[in-house]
Amino acid sequence: MEECLKMIYTRRSIRVYSDRQISDEDIEKILKAAMLAPSAGNEQPWHFIVVRDREMLKKMSEAFTFGQMLPNASAAIVVCADPKLSKYPYDMWVQDCSAATENILLAARCLGIGSVWLGVYPREERMKALRELLGIPENIVVFSVVSLGYPKDEKDFYEADDRFNPDRIHREKW
């Protein structure tokens, strides 16, 4: 199997982390991958906040129903958007930031780092909580948070059950 596909097929939401810290160099590699995501009209509307402070990660976890992994994460990346950068009258930044978030997940997997995508947008209470905690300006939309850490057990990277479903594929028309 090609190495790239292996990384995709074995990417999981990893919620239990070891104490090993992620290097600044690897965080930068992950952010570079995020910034190489496709964006409508090449507008690249994203901004990223890297959070490593353990107390802040704990506070951030309280904004989520399922954010319990954040206090033990090595880092979190908050993906934000500046909708004013849009060249179009519709919100293409949502797709752009989704692509950037997925690139973060895949780059982390390629580096042996576990990750979890925590949805923020369009949940107003989550956006408000993170905006207040992190000093994010009102004109910036908080899109997602990605929790990052080395898995406590390397076996967490396993190939999932085959989710391929030919019934969901339509050729030429529905």
From Swiss-Prot:
It is an enzyme of class 1 (oxidoreductase). Coiled coil: none annotated. Its EC number is 1.-.-.-. Its cofactor is FMN. NAD(+) binds at A107, A108, R109, C110, L111, G112. SUPFAM superfamilies: FMN-dependent nitroreductase-like. Pfam families: Nitroreductase. Signal peptide: none annotated. Disulfide bonds: none annotated. GO terms for molecular function: oxidoreductase activity. Keywords: Flavoprotein, FMN, NAD, NADP, Oxidoreductase. Belongs to the nitroreductase family. This is Putative NADH dehydrogenase/NAD(P)H nitroreductase AF_2267. It comes from Archaeoglobus fulgidus (strain ATCC 49558 / DSM 4304 / JCM 9628 / NBRC 100126 / VC-16). The lineage of its organism: Archaea, Methanobacteriati, Methanobacteriota, Archaeoglobi, Archaeoglobales.
